[in-house]
Amino acid sequence: MIRQLLICAALVFNISLYAQVAEHKPAQYNVNGTLWQQQSGEYKALCYQAFNLARLRLQEILMTNKDSIPLAVITDVDETVLDNSPSAARDILNGKTFNPADWKVWVDMAKANAMPGAVEFFNYAAQHGVQCFYITNRKEDEKTATMQNLQQQGFPQVDAMHVMTKQGSVSDKEPRRQEVAKKYNVVLLVGDNLNDFDDLFFEKPTAERNANVDKSQAFFGSKYIVLPNATYGDWENALWQGQKLSGEEKDKVKWASLIGY
């Protein structure tokens, strides 16, 4: 009898545990990624590595460049030069997912810290006559706070011309990159998202994004400098191919996308 009771108790425990795992808790998906960004030395090392490589490439370019066209570097802002992990952590602790209202509160605080190595690299670029453009998909009404945050962290050339926010609902950065390219030779692009580099990756499904990465192999580390980001990105949107899915539906797509053996 005791043995049967123990077996029943174990079954109830396992069913309860499975239910907890299966329950949709979207904010908890970000726990590991956010902790990694905030606590791991490996994350910091990868950031330093990216900006060290960017500096080496820029040094090479400056030594060999003979064009009269002024040089420029284009960078993304979020998770490329500014660390927004406190916003993600707050969402997790409050059991929330990303929402524009809470994001606006965070942006207006202008308290994001600089990514490791970012300030040093961009000041090096500016000191050598290179123009630094910050192309971000933050909204126009977030521009003032964004500029304040960048200035407080010590980034150079932070003004209305160099900080280019999203206009309207268009998230594609290619028109803004082309605007810079009309006057400058863009020698480096820095970002955490493939859309920060080329229109090849904008709103493409997973297979096409990955195929285009392979086609662009020569640019990574030479013209494209990629920062790590394990908390969010357009790679997720690519999984559900632009469909408007509920949290539960996104869960199903994620589980179905895992490759085991």
Where are these predicted regions, by residue range?
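Bacterial Sec-dependent N-terminal signal peptides
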Residues: 1-23
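Metal-dependent phosphoesterase signature
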Residues: 88-114
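Sec-exported extracytoplasmic/periplasmic mature domains
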Residues: 59, 63, 87, 123-131, ...
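Short, acidic loop-to-helix structural element flanking the phosphoryl-transfer center
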Residues: 105-133, 140
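C-terminal cap/substrate-recognition subdomain and adjoining C-terminal extension
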Residues: 24, 41, 139, 143-261
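Non-catalytic pre-domain segments flanking phosphatase-related domains
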Residues: 17-75, 240-261
